[in-house]
Amino acid sequence: MVKIVIHEERCHGCGNCVIACPVNACNSPNVWGGKGPEDGEDVVIKVVNGTVSVINEDLCEACMTCELACPVDAIEIKT
């Protein structure tokens, strides 16, 4: 089972992780275009009120792309 840990004190809501996530890109045309996902789309993470939030951890494939995309090490994938 995958656990996504968000270090909210570090996150500044840039959205790099949201756009980098391949699951998000496959499930949301907006993410594929470099924008945030819409409400109701099947995504793993998204920026909510200026901080990244886990939306559906079960969709995470533990590829670590989001973790690598974060410039401030605010997201951590634990397997």
Swiss-Prot record:
| Principal EC category | oxidoreductase
Where do the annotations place [4Fe-4S] cluster 1 binding?
A: C11, C14, C17, C70
Known regulation of its activity is: Not inactivated by cyanide.
In terms of Gene3D superfamilies, this protein maps to: 3.30.70.20
Q: Which UniProt keywords apply?
A: 4Fe-4S, Electron transport, Iron, Iron-sulfur, Metal-binding, Methanogenesis, Oxidoreductase, Repeat, Transport
Q: In which pathway does it act?
A: One-carbon metabolism; methanogenesis from CO(2); 5,10-methenyl-5,6,7,8-tetrahydromethanopterin from CO(2): step 1/3
Q: Which cofactor does it need?
A: [4Fe-4S] cluster
Binding-site residues, [4Fe-4S] cluster 2: C21, C60, C63, C66
Does the keyword NAD feature in the UniProt annotation?
no
Entries under PROSITE patterns matching the protein: 4FE4S_FER_1, 4FE4S_FER_2
Its source organism is: Methanopyrus kandleri (strain AV19 / DSM 6324 / JCM 9639 / NBRC 100938)
Q: What is this protein called?
A: Tungsten-containing formylmethanofuran dehydrogenase 2 subunit G
According to the record, cofactor stoichiometry and binding are noted as: Binds 2 [4Fe-4S] clusters.
Query: Can you tell which superkingdom this protein's organism belongs to?
Result: Archaea
Its biological purpose is as follows:
Catalyzes the reversible oxidation of CO(2) and methanofuran (MFR) to N-formylmethanofuran (CHO-MFR). This enzyme is oxygen-labile. May function as an electron transfer protein.
- Please name the InterPro entries in this protein's record: 4Fe4S_Fe-S-bd, 4Fe4S_Fe_S_CS
What EC number(s) does its UniProt record assign?
Answer: 1.2.7.12
Please list the GO terms describing molecular function.
Answer: 4 iron, 4 sulfur cluster binding; formylmethanofuran dehydrogenase activity; metal ion binding
Q: According to its UniProt record, which reaction does this protein catalyse? A: N-formylmethanofuran + 2 oxidized [2Fe-2S]-[ferredoxin] + H2O = methanofuran + 2 reduced [2Fe-2S]-[ferredoxin] + CO2 + H(+)
Q: Give yes or no: UniProt keyword RNA-binding.
A: no
